[in-house]
Amino acid sequence: MPTREGDNQAKILERLMYLDPPIKKFPVTPEDPAMAVCFLDLKDVCYITTKADQGRDETMFMTTGKKSFYSNLRLSDIEERLKEHPHFLKTSKFYLVNLTKIRGLKMSAARDLWFEGLEDPVLNAVTNTYLAEFEKRFK
């Protein structure tokens, strides 16, 4: 019997983690130069991407309000900080996506994703390397 109670407690804790994630805000470069740093609500973030392939070190947070915010942290550092966050998942070498903001998807050689508040899809957002985990999280 104790195992069953422990299993139930684990399921309850998992559900609570989903409803109330451990990290709610993330530090980004502020729009207002008077501020040293501002904190972005992660619930508003559609995806996080890097332009490392273009020789730029900055990481961009795209929000449902079509606003971009930047961080000097590498995508891998952000991924490490968000690894316990149930809403975020790495879907390619260049993207971490907020699973709660996805409103559509196109299956092709790579998967394109549409997000709440954004008109255009993010092309090749889910690559084959990360597809199994992506599909698992949507089941």
What are the roles of these predicted feature ranges?
Residues 114-133:
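Charge-dense polyanion-binding interfaces
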Residues 4-117:
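Conserved binding/recognition cores within well-folded domains
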